[in-house]
Amino acid sequence: LSKLPGEIVSANAYMGVEGILKALDMGADVVITGRVADPAIFMAPAIHAFGWSLEDWDKLGKGTMMGHLLECGGQVTGGYFAEPGKKDVPGLGHLGFPIAEIAEDGSFFLTKVPEAGGMVTVETCSEQIVYEIHDPENYLTPDVVANFKQVSFTELEKDKVKVEGAAGKPKTETFKCSIGYKDCFIGDGEISYGGTGCVARGKLALEILRERLELVAPGVFDELKFDLIGCNSLYWSSDCQYNQEPSEVRVRVAGRAKTRTEADIIGNEVEALYTNGPAGGCGAVKHTRDIVSVASILVSRYDVKPEAELFTV
């Protein structure tokens, strides 16, 4: 922690089911938590309802599998899945969230209400299972080390998928803890160019901005990024990869600086392109924001004591 470049402003340990169980045991109808691992939100009610032991690792592995599939809501009912003509999803404008029906032995299936949009299929479940898990045989959570290696999906009927094969191993002695610290300021500016020659005018705008920032703020920015949105903002190629020139592009420049005043320079220079840059610039915007960055450490689980308080409203 002493090596972090800025002032620490937050520390949030990823807790498990313990605090949620305390709240449920107190009779809570709604539980509001601090930072907990996503699967714990869904697994805790199952533990509470069925009286599972917190050392029944296979049941906890199954519960974690359920929570992992549910944690991002509409992602398992077709959100973040659709690709027209290849993976079509009906009703994304009224996408339904998933429902898990779980039995005491930890077996469960996923579904959704029939009138809601989206779909629950083997394919949507298969994409969600690999989301953010790193090693499927050792998915580390505060409550269990889950093993998803043998998980299988079976479509029982339309929008109803059975999930089997999850297991678990004893939990680790540590919690992940996210440390927030004051890092820098980021300034950015954008301006659009459209019509014939828009790519050439966008490139000229970027050349002007490079020259201006070197002139008015030499050595100020720790990092600078120059994008021509519509050509190279996602893949960082040096040129537009089109057989035909696009009808519009958007120039974007962003940079990291140590002070807000320095970061403001970028947006001001982009805005100046209205009158001092290529023809036809429009829609300029600028922003400056202070950045709280995140570093991750491990802390002893025994140093973190969840508490619960019951309110009646």
Annotate each predicted stretch with a short phrase.
Residues L1-T33:
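An acidic, phosphate/nucleotide-engaging active-site surface
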Residues L24, A28, L54, L69-T77, ...:
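Structural signal for hydrophobic packing residues in well-ordered secondary-structure cores
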Residues L60-P170, I186:
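A conserved active-site cap/scaffold subdomain adjacent to cofactor or substrate pockets
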